[in-house]
Amino acid sequence: MQNAHRSRRILGAWLFTSALLLVGCSEKAPDGSDAGTDDRPRVALIMKSLANEFFISMADGARAHQAANPERYSLVVNGIKNESDLAQQVALMEQMMATGVDVIVIAPADSKALLPVARRAVQQDIVVVNIDNQFDRQLLAEMDIAIPFVGPDNRDGARRVGERLAAELEPGDEVAIIGGIPGAFNARERAAGFTDAMQAADITVVSTQAADWEQSKAASIASALLREYPQLDALLCANDSMALGAMAAVRQAGRSGEVRIVGFDNIGAANALVQSGELVATADQHADRLAVYGIEYALEILETGQIPTDRTTPVDVISGES
């Protein structure tokens, strides 16, 4: 595998340098070296929405890691404009493949829709590592490709956040879940984890709705839920952006302090609300390290040729008690 990667570098180097300038949301060249003589592995990080603070932290962490290890690899960072722009993410994958990168670390917007282009990358001997949102395992098996997932156990993390919320509720209380994109594995796992915790505490989930990870959609959904279920005691949101939207709706309804809210991701704004007591809890999956975990593992695969396997990364519950 290593020889195949080296053989592509001369052909792809100038294309990679051009891509650093042409991709709309991408990293500039990490150093002043001549791309034509640069024998370092070329790594592309492709994320979801760069409007989300979580992915900004992920990108910053990756850049800092590359800056601390400039001799090990070069890096280009890409993101899409919104969480559901699958076509743009596919286009970014294809563009990075055309430049002859050695590694693609991807946080896919959808667990199935990105797999065909990911398979083409693997067939080109590009090391592909999946982070954040897990690719569909059944479809991977049907395609007969090995793409490792490096990331947290989303169901367990959401369950533990839900348990923290349940400690403030009573059996029979009513809650609703505001989830992410239905086609995303991590969205389904977080909703399942929230449900696990509520069922264990004999708390009633009156509704589960998708806000596609978006703050404004979550605000609209939360407003409707508050009207439909006037006895609603809590909202469990599958990411912090949606938790912020839900909180805005609760404030507008004049129910601050009555309707409890939890999130997931531990972005800065949410962490501040946890510390002030306005948000019960969130989950920290360490955005600034998540891409780094993926990059490190991809470089290990590239160097050793080992068969890739999944790796679980930390997730911690953040509450006023932590």
Spans of features found by a protein language model:
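Short beta-strand elements in bilobed, periplasmic/extracellular small-molecule ligand-binding domains
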Residues: 68-82, 174-177, 195-215
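Hydrophobic alpha-helical segments within soluble ligand-binding/sensing domains
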Residues: 43, 89, 149-175, 217-218, ...
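Extracytoplasmic "Venus flytrap"
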Residues: 42-61, 65, 69, 76-90, ...
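Hydrophobic alpha-helical
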Residues: 106-123, 194, 206-207, 211-272
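Hinge/cleft segment of the Venus flytrap/periplasmic-binding protein
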Residues: 12, 25-27, 32-39, 178, ...
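Short, low-complexity disordered leader/linker segments with a strong preference
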Residues: 1-42, 119-124
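Short, solvent-exposed amphipathic alpha-helices that sit
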Residues: 54-69, 157-161, 185-204, 217, ...
